[in-house]
Amino acid sequence: MPAYRSRTSTHGRNMAGARGLWRATGMKDGDFGKPIIAVVNSFTQFVPGHVHLKDLGQLVAREIEKAGGVAKEFNTIAVDDGIAMGHDGMLYSLPSREIIADSVEYMVNAHCADAMVCISNCDKITPGMLMAAMRLNIPAVFVSGGPMEAGKVLLSTGEKKVDLIDAMIAAADDRVSDEDVKVMERSACPTCGSCSGMFTANSMNCLTEALGLALPGNGSVLATHADRERLFVEAGHLVVDLARRYYEQDDAGVLPRTIASFKAFENAMTLDISMGGSTNTVLHLLAAANEGEVPFTMADIDRLSRKVPVLCKVAPAVANIHMEDVHRAGGIMGILGELDRAGLIHTDLPTVHAPSMKDALERWDVTRTKAESVTTFYRAAPGGVPTQVAFSQSRRWDDLDTDRASGVIRDFEHAYSKDGGLAVLFGNIAEDGCIVKTAGVDASILKFTGPARIFESQDAAVEAILANGKIKAGDIVLIRYEGPRGGPGMQEMLYPTSYLKSKGLGKACALVTDGRFSGGSSGLSIGHVSPEAAEGGAIGLVEEGDTIEIDIPNRRIHLAISDEEMARRRAAMEAKGDAAWKPKDRQRVVSQALQAYAALTTSAARGAVRDVKSLRR
């Protein structure tokens, strides 16, 4: 029987000093035999997805105490990728994932917490906490802050839903007036919550449902809706139950590594492919699997991408559909239900809230259940009032969207595409693979050949795209030395993709990079090229004007030069000595913190995780 971890610091004569300090936090005599639960919050006023979390940690804490536990809250950092976008702030986004994971480990292990509730929401916070949960392997429940309501603008053609990506594209389009840009800006992000489309934050919060570590509705019920409060209340009670099952009944089935098994990672990736989730999820799932010693790799993602169809399309892949619409159609449990009927997921796996995913689907899939509590829950609608307050409205749709032929969520027979929403491409400039969000690629450019336009920083590419005439239809914009090590930090390329759209080139150009893309990116955007240029990847050998062939149906990307020419270029690069595999004439200040990150990070094909073995070299 495993002993409660907390008793290391709460029991025994020699822990009198520690108990004295615990008492100073409010603990009483009767508390020292209870499980100590870490409430891992991520409140900050910098991030709209986290601005409403301030009081939610204490909401969970009160429920933990009602259930017989002792709750202790702490905070992690949280970076807003949208605000950090387009300048050197984006260098810090991906590295913050490791800082978050480490900070959770530090706090939980230093204070011997028995279990934890992870209150996350935005891009790197959910992945960082997920990595920590897999690393620590103590009972854990995830509950996110929830998606924001979609913005709405009234145009001459009628009302249109919008988000921050629409505002960015409009701002770079000379045909859009300053006043219309202001209207878009003021309407794009009306409430607290993670950005309203299927961007990275919402993708990851959906995947925690598929992994079995979060309650149904975690990925889709709006931050503003009163129904979301129930998730926080239930998480507080549930985590105490899980802790008791593990420490008092020796039930290891409640631990993250048992729940988030290899098959669960397959489920999560299958969901991601079926809903056209952010390409960043590939990085984060690989990293979380690595922490839990789960042998889930790019090869598994490639295998799944070849058989999983697209059953749900959400902004930015399609206009006017956002997370509030996915929720109305049954949320993540609705998509998983269709994947189950198609025989594409494993349902014999445990979750934190049900004995198996099969049991969860029987209760929560709106096409199977007639339970009024469930159908009412999925009718939770946007309130339409700008606010930064959680649970501030309780509006409901009159009915559900259960049309699986032409609704937001489709069944297998009526899939948007039989080919999945994400694909892994391989070739002579991406020997370890690269990722494209096929759900956001127009069918007319699934095969694309063009000349490479070389840029060794995102800034240089943006400057060229905005300079009318420098980038032409048919070009392939290639941005290198922006990978995990080369950036460092693997910047998101949201501005280049958005500006291509604003210049009318969204369906006429491709973008290839060893950096990554925002969940808000769409178009023929190929990222995570591995190995990256800074690690000797062949992307560093491409020359201006070289022809690149992209063939998504056949999962291929190819630089049209001979093997002999590739070898000649590699030898010439290696002959440069210390200047080899480095960008030319790029002026970028790299702090010591980022230098330390670059020294330890690995390829995107491995999730850009740290390789501590390098410390022993």
From Swiss-Prot:
This is Dihydroxy-acid dehydratase. InterPro entries: Dihydro-acid_dehy_C (IPR042096), DihydroxyA_deHydtase (IPR004404), DiOHA_6PGluconate_deHydtase_CS (IPR020558), ILV_EDD_C (IPR056740), ILV_EDD_N (IPR000581), IlvD/EDD_N (IPR037237). [2Fe-2S] cluster binds at C122, C195. The keyword Iron applies. It comes from the Bacteria. It is an enzyme of class 4 (lyase). The modification N6-carboxylysine is found at K124. Binds 1 [2Fe-2S] cluster per subunit. This cluster acts as a Lewis acid cofactor. One of its GO terms (molecular function) is magnesium ion binding.
